[in-house]
Design a protein with these regions (language model features):
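Conserved short strand/loop->alpha-helix "switch" segment adjacent to the catalytic nucleotide/phosphoryl-transfer site
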Residues: 55-86, 90-100
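Short acidic helix/loop segment immediately C-terminal to the autophosphorylated histidine
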Residues: 1-11, 33-34
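Acidic ATP/Mg2+-coordinating residue in the GHKL
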Residues: 118
């Protein structure tokens, strides 16, 4: 009988969470009449609650401001991105005092914007990306959403994603 090491367990848990994020899209679509677009605020709120339940320990407040309507195809990629960024913040950004994660959504002239910011300990955003999660976020943003991502580290980490 083979046992997973810690890395394997972590990867499996993250894959399970990504699958649950896609399931959340289906739940929201069943509750509404328009099945081609959905409220990002509702979806990300449900998703953030689900992710938070998986991380006990310190208290983290997750707030969502604004709303945009996104196509189902975009929602799948955005859900995985939110999952990765929120999970990273929950795992690495905060000490025993907890903290806050803010997700801001807006759209101007067809350009959508999603900001995910935490008030945690931060890291060097200019260093080469070595984590699978952040590499996935960058790849999905650029290749699938045909957008861009920028990150800054001041009083925590802020990721700003833009796409059409």
């Amino acid at each position: 009988k083979k046992h997973l090491d810690e890395t394997g367990k972590t990867m499996l848990a993250e894959a399970e969470q990504n699958i649950r994020s896609i399931g959340k899209i289906h739940e929201i679509l069943y509750r509404q009449q328009n099945i081609s677009r959905l409220s990002a605020k509702e979806y990300f709120g449900d998703l953030a609650d689900e992710i938070k339940r998986g991380y006990s320990g310190h208290f983290v407040d997750i707030r969502i401001e604004g709303d945009i309507q996104i196509a189902v195809e975009q929602a799948i990629y955005c859900g995985i991105i939110i999952n990765e960024l929120v999970t990273n913040a929950l795992k690495y950004a905060f000490d025993e005092n907890g903290g806050r994660i803010d997700i801001k959504l807006s759209e101007t002239g067809g350009q959508k914007s999603m900001t995910v910011a935490d008030n945690g300990r931060g890291y060097d955003v200019d260093a080469p990306i070595t984590s699978f999660g952040l590499s996935l976020v960058q790849k999905l943003t650029e290749d699938e959403l045909k957008g861009s991502i920028s990150s800054t580290s001041k009083d925590g980490i802020t990721h700003i994603l833009r796409w059409s």
